[in-house]
Amino acid sequence: MATIHVDGKTLEVDGADNLLQACLSLGLDIPYFCWHPALGSVGACRQCAVKQYTDENDKRGRLVMSCMTPATDNTWISIEDEEAKQFRASVVEWLMTNHPHDCPVCEEGGHCHLQDMTVMTGHNERRYRFTKRTHQNQELGPFIAHEMNRCIACYRCVRYYKDYAGGTDLGVYGAHDNVYFGRVEDGVLESEFSGNLTEVCPTGVFTDKTHSERYNRKWDMQFAPSICHGCSSGCNISPGERYGEIRRIENRYNGSVNHYFLCDRGRFGYGYVNREDRPRQPLLVLSKQKLSLDGALDQAAALLKERKVVGIGSPRASLESNFALRELVGEGNFYSGINEGELDRLRLILQVMQEGPLPVPSIRDIEDHDAVFVLGEDLTQTAARIALALRQSVKGKAVEMAADMKVQPWLDAAVKNIAQHAQNPLFIASVSATRLDDVAEETVHAAPDDLARLGFAVAHAIDPSAPSVADLDPQAQAFAQRITDALLAAKRPLVVSGNSLGNKALIEAAANIAKALKQREKNGSISLVVGEANSLGLALFGGDSVEAALERLTSGQADAVVVLENDLYRRTDAARVDAALAAAKVVIVADHQQTATTAKAHLVLPAASFAEGDGTLVSQEGRAQRFFQVFDPTYYDARNMVREGWRWLHAIHSTLQGKRVDWTQLDHVTEAVAEAKPILAGIRDAAPAASFRIKGLKLAREPHRYSGRTAMRANISVHEPRTPQDIDSAFAFSMEGYSGSQEDRQQIPFAWSPGWNSPQAWNKFQDEVGGHLRAGDPGVRLIEPKGEGLDWFQAVPVPFSAKADSWKVVPLYHLFGSEENSSRAAPIQQRIPETYVALSKEDADRLGVNDGATLGFQLKGQALRLPLRIDEQLGAGLIGLPVGFAGIPAAIAGCSVEGLQEAAQ
């Protein structure tokens, strides 16, 4: 700690910070542009000037840039010094000489950092009366709009995009006051994290194009704290709604998880919530009859009465909804909705997390590891936010080298110059090239079984008591030794693996490496990636596979099925699903999307998406997190009967039993889950109860400037209805409630503080800028390792051997296209590649086919015709297929393809 003196006040700060960060952490306001908590200091904008004095007797002082000045002990500064204030105002004024006068039509207006800083400096009159510099804008794809004339040349965009996120197609061109930030030519921004430019940019150069198409100001949107459902990472988001539509998604700061950044799937994949073809009223499918609320409950109860019912849950539904289904059908009749192979691997992952020797790190904690081995995962496609964290972990070497030279880590340019190209080691073993390969020390591409053999070899090299690998070729053995040396040399090694390749041996090999590291007394971690937002929650919750449920229907052991938020055709073979649904006398589906399964239902119940309901998810870290309802859809249309899955299912259960509904609010069902499943007892603490208040007030979902509420339904009726009442949470569907930053709270719908309207307002909610929220980061970890309860896994697979007339399927994942719901969003659909089949160059040459040729083959009894994509990194004997794409069967990992040949045109 250090003592600094600011305008006559003596304050305690972290001496490792710069003055700007230290003062912001104290709640003091200093305007800035180029500095960002995640990017460090470069001193480019000169906006954060303060007056520094030699000591208490110095009356003259000198101007310094606070972002470039360390907060050393006994520093004397003034923020309110008149010369410093005039200097800061002059900086804003000359930045404004070329900035257009377009705030009323700029999408950034109302959450613009430039607006905030201009007001903060007191600049309110333009004296420049001459021609402004202008630029040609670029077309950057479906996610981001480009308006270069608004640029103030703070360099944040390229520092984030190139230096932080590893992008290569955005740069800065030109010189002096005529610089241009963009691509060499028009084209889609290639980075999977490009959407963060909309929050990193302090002006309106890069704006959310998906929001611009249905635009409204930040102060006119209703927000709620939510969790991204796009993968298992558990990123915190703030969805904004107007007129019953989600208009945009902003990053919600969580110092342990996503920090300041999201991936593009999570930011732009919300369009499925707004689709016109969503179920919004209960429907008898055969007669196409829409039902009332009571009619739907009576119909469901009549259909299920005296039936042998099974329930199929879902890893994309909340714990509460899955529990309500289990209560409806009985514990022995509840099935997880996950295919048997994936469920088996999930149980193994859970065993490793619970009984293994090493902890699972948070995403933020991943950045602090100094040697990483990724085994079998293409993380940018399966858990993109973890991939971004790994990009930061390799930069730890630069910080370490800078510390040895007494250079502070926030001096961004100096740290980079010291390190040059030195990085912490990252090793990647995958079936094909990944988007992280550019920062990896070494990569290897091989069949899943061979990757697992490499992992087992690494474990054995770390600790010879681990099972050895027979017949490992010398090249692989040498590679395993290099990985071993790096992991043992590290202070905090990390091994990352997961479920995506459908190979159990990969997870077992990763677990052996973790055990071996613990045996060598390394302070390491293990991170295991799972498929969906609540996959780990379902593994904790229990329930057999979807195939087991279908078998009960096909065999006649059950004659009715209730399916919760699950398209069974994406889980297992279509023929098996067809047979089971045909055998069932009653099929009831509760979902928020039209799917192949809802088309086969007798009764469809409109379930809530994440935007219309509350619930709890468990991320791949084992962190239980609550998402909250953003808006009440019935406010805009009384015919809309969308309800949370747990509400529908509990109401049906109560109707069947002829009793009143017991669970009238979320806290009731959450408490019931916690009591029924002791391992899930911690979900009580995932968020405050509905009774939580600050100064006697509920928490406001809407900014206090929210306008038009009394006119929003005037086209329906001039009589204004009562504001929807939220009995499930501590939030109000109103601007009336607490929305400030002074009182500590974890669940924050939107970031706003007086004078701070942009995303930089998160500074006001943190214990220190870039640290954790003052009230603690949202969520609660449910799983901690027990130590030495896990034995060595012994089943080392045999080497993969390519065959002349048969190919082994490896699943290939795409950030845009492999996840079910985001793929329904129009902007995401523009980024989904055409369905393809991938072969190695060796196999393509042997078959005599070229890139783009149409290949025909049989897979799981289904005939496919797909264009060929030659993959130089794919091994011979392997055939790659994109997961989740149209026409690709479910559960393809490890299947065999035969009869592969060029199809007749």
Swiss-Prot record:
<keyword id="KW-0004">4Fe-4S</keyword>
<keyword id="KW-0874">Quinone</keyword>
<keyword id="KW-0411">Iron-sulfur</keyword>
<feature type="binding site">
    <location>
        <position position="99"/>
    </location>
    <ligand>
        <name>[4Fe-4S] cluster 1</name>
    </ligand>
</feature>
<dbReference type="Pfam" id="PF10588">
    <property type="entry name" value="NADH-G_4Fe-4S_3"/>
</dbReference>
<keyword id="KW-0520">NAD</keyword>
<keyword id="KW-0830">Ubiquinone</keyword>
<dbReference type="GO" id="GO:0008137">
    <property type="term" value="F:NADH dehydrogenase (ubiquinone) activity"/>
</dbReference>
<comment type="similarity">
    <text>Belongs to the complex I 75 kDa subunit family.</text>
</comment>
<feature type="domain" description="2Fe-2S ferredoxin-type">
    <location>
        <begin position="1"/>
        <end position="83"/>
    </location>
</feature>
<comment type="subunit">
    <text>Composed of 13 different subunits. Subunits NuoCD, E, F, and G constitute the peripheral sector of the complex.</text>
</comment>
<feature type="binding site">
    <location>
        <position position="201"/>
    </location>
    <ligand>
        <name>[4Fe-4S] cluster 2</name>
    </ligand>
</feature>
<keyword id="KW-1278">Translocase</keyword>
<feature type="binding site">
    <location>
        <position position="112"/>
    </location>
    <ligand>
        <name>[4Fe-4S] cluster 1</name>
    </ligand>
</feature>
<dbReference type="GO" id="GO:0051539">
    <property type="term" value="F:4 iron, 4 sulfur cluster binding"/>
</dbReference>
<dbReference type="Pfam" id="PF13510">
    <property type="entry name" value="Fer2_4"/>
</dbReference>
<dbReference type="InterPro" id="IPR019574">
    <property type="entry name" value="NADH_UbQ_OxRdtase_Gsu_4Fe4S-bd"/>
</dbReference>
<dbReference type="InterPro" id="IPR000283">
    <property type="entry name" value="NADH_UbQ_OxRdtase_75kDa_su_CS"/>
</dbReference>
<dbReference type="InterPro" id="IPR036010">
    <property type="entry name" value="2Fe-2S_ferredoxin-like_sf"/>
</dbReference>
<comment type="function">
    <text>NDH-1 shuttles electrons from NADH, via FMN and iron-sulfur (Fe-S) centers, to quinones in the respiratory chain. The immediate electron acceptor for the enzyme in this species is believed to be ubiquinone. Couples the redox reaction to proton translocation (for every two electrons transferred, four hydrogen ions are translocated across the cytoplasmic membrane), and thus conserves the redox energy in a proton gradient.</text>
</comment>
<dbReference type="InterPro" id="IPR001041">
    <property type="entry name" value="2Fe-2S_ferredoxin-type"/>
</dbReference>
<feature type="binding site">
    <location>
        <position position="154"/>
    </location>
    <ligand>
        <name>[4Fe-4S] cluster 2</name>
    </ligand>
</feature>
<dbReference type="InterPro" id="IPR054351">
    <property type="entry name" value="NADH_UbQ_OxRdtase_ferredoxin"/>
</dbReference>
<keyword id="KW-0479">Metal-binding</keyword>
<keyword id="KW-0001">2Fe-2S</keyword>
<feature type="domain" description="4Fe-4S Mo/W bis-MGD-type">
    <location>
        <begin position="221"/>
        <end position="277"/>
    </location>
</feature>
<dbReference type="InterPro" id="IPR050123">
    <property type="entry name" value="Prok_molybdopt-oxidoreductase"/>
</dbReference>
<dbReference type="GO" id="GO:0022904">
    <property type="term" value="P:respiratory electron transport chain"/>
</dbReference>
<dbReference type="GO" id="GO:0048038">
    <property type="term" value="F:quinone binding"/>
</dbReference>
<dbReference type="InterPro" id="IPR010228">
    <property type="entry name" value="NADH_UbQ_OxRdtase_Gsu"/>
</dbReference>
<feature type="binding site">
    <location>
        <position position="235"/>
    </location>
    <ligand>
        <name>[4Fe-4S] cluster 3</name>
    </ligand>
</feature>
<feature type="binding site">
    <location>
        <position position="48"/>
    </location>
    <ligand>
        <name>[2Fe-2S] cluster</name>
    </ligand>
</feature>
<feature type="binding site">
    <location>
        <position position="151"/>
    </location>
    <ligand>
        <name>[4Fe-4S] cluster 2</name>
    </ligand>
</feature>
<feature type="domain" description="4Fe-4S His(Cys)3-ligated-type">
    <location>
        <begin position="83"/>
        <end position="122"/>
    </location>
</feature>
<dbReference type="InterPro" id="IPR009010">
    <property type="entry name" value="Asp_de-COase-like_dom_sf"/>
</dbReference>
<protein>
    <recommendedName>
        <fullName>NADH-quinone oxidoreductase subunit G</fullName>
        <ecNumber>7.1.1.-</ecNumber>
    </recommendedName>
</protein>
<dbReference type="InterPro" id="IPR006963">
    <property type="entry name" value="Mopterin_OxRdtase_4Fe-4S_dom"/>
</dbReference>
<feature type="binding site">
    <location>
        <position position="103"/>
    </location>
    <ligand>
        <name>[4Fe-4S] cluster 1</name>
    </ligand>
</feature>
<dbReference type="InterPro" id="IPR006656">
    <property type="entry name" value="Mopterin_OxRdtase"/>
</dbReference>
<feature type="binding site">
    <location>
        <position position="231"/>
    </location>
    <ligand>
        <name>[4Fe-4S] cluster 3</name>
    </ligand>
</feature>
<feature type="binding site">
    <location>
        <position position="45"/>
    </location>
    <ligand>
        <name>[2Fe-2S] cluster</name>
    </ligand>
</feature>
<dbReference type="Pfam" id="PF22117">
    <property type="entry name" value="Fer4_Nqo3"/>
</dbReference>
